């Protein structure tokens, strides 16, 4: 019996599909589902989103969005935290935050989950950087380290607890150390 190959979905066809839980991402004709959030990732995502919001909100500099679908450059990804500076946040006709973000974040933050490919996550970060994102972080809770990149050609690893992590220039009020971030897992 001859099997007809299944035609891969286009990005537009993917976006018309119902959302999945956990979220699915699209790139290069492939759909991949993110792993189900687990304890460490959930705590880091919650606490980091809160910490960023505390720093951003007084001056309305930016907003941190957990699990926000960002579609740009032929891909549709869902960073664990997507940060947008205030004037780049899409708005609807009523001036409210749009439900659809057809643009790259200014800062993308991913948290490595058990069983998730570090390469796949880095590809998403590099895709963001190639399309205008200022910085990407990859938190590895099992190794208590943070990989920081401001271009696909440059990745730095931070693992000393007292190390203050670099941030994009718009976020210069944010002063977080490796120890503070991974300390949230023991609270």
Provide a role label for each language-model segment.
Residues 1-187:
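Gly/Pro/Ser/Thr-rich low-complexity, intrinsically disordered segments predominantly at protein N-termini
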